[in-house]
Design a protein with these regions (language model features):
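Hydrophobic alpha-helical segments at protein termini of multi-pass membrane proteins
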Residues: 1-244
Length: 244
């Protein structure tokens, strides 16, 4: 399905809440812009390593349908280890951050990811998920009226916000794990990637099950639940006085 100019213009509106969040954190919470840059930088380095490992390991297993669950789990682990690993590296070299600076770190990741998604026809191009993603987009393109509005615009818009919340929660958990020497928050963050990028994301897209609207609804519900859990975990683990 080819995107119209209206589709492309609407896709860029997903950046508006991120612009508001960045402005709020910078001007109301005195968060320096470099915190957003650090976050997006950690995501970029993590994605580079993730793509190398994906093409070197995960993609070699994609042709065996009987291994899809294991392949999906491996993809989730690779995604979590690379992205969270680079966040951990950044946190190890950065000075102690405030709560809002850690939040900004995650917002920076959500912003750059949303920008890539809004400006790329198919972010999964060149992967084993490219065909399934194209089929999903074509299916949504055949919808009209209310369903087209919901599945073509509202839910994809919501997905970027949900993903940003997951990034904020997981990076917050990684930060807490590093400064408290408690591995449980890190395990929780890794489990979120295992489920979101692996069991839910990779497996369902690879099997083409997201073309079923009921499965698509369950996917968004599952991702929303993960976002709530990791954000709640970050808030609960964060000490009242911070780490300053």
């Amino acid at each position: 399905m080819k995107r119209t100019s209206g589709d492309r213009a609407f896709s860029l509106t997903v950046l508006l809440p991120f612009a508001v969040a960045i402005g709020y954190l910078h001007y109301s919470k005195d968060v320096p812009f470099k915190c957003f840059i650090y976050g997006s930088g950690s995501w970029g380095f993590g994605c580079i390593l993730k793509l190398v490992l994906y093409h070197g390991v995960v993609r070699r297993l994609r042709h065996d349908p009987s291994r899809i669950l294991g392949t999906a789990a491996l993809n989730g682990l690779v995604s979590g280890i690379t992205e969270l690993g680079f966040a951990l590296v950044f946190f190890a070299f950065l000075p102690v951050l405030t709560f809002w600076e850690v939040v900004a770190f995650g917002v920076g990741i959500g912003t750059i990811e949303a920008f890539v998604g809004a400006t790329t026809a198919n972010p999964l191009k060149g992967t084993a998920l490219e065909k399934s993603a194209d089929e999903l987009e074509a299916m949504v393109g055949r919808l009209s009226g209310g369903p087209r509005l919901v599945y073509g615009y509202i839910l994809p818009f919501s997905e970027r916000v949900i993903a940003a919340v997951i990034h904020i929660g997981t990076r917050g958990l990684v930060y807490v794990a590093y400064h408290s020497a408690n591995p449980l928050p890190l395990v929780m963050a890794l489990a979120a990637f295992f489920l979101a990028d692996g069991i839910i994301g990779y497996r369902l897209i690879h099997q083409g099950r997201l073309c079923d609207l009921r499965a698509l609804n369950k996917t968004y519900a599952g991702l929303s639940a993960i976002a709530v859990i990791v954000l709640a975990g970050f808030l609960l683990y964060w000490p009242e006085g911070g780490y300053g």
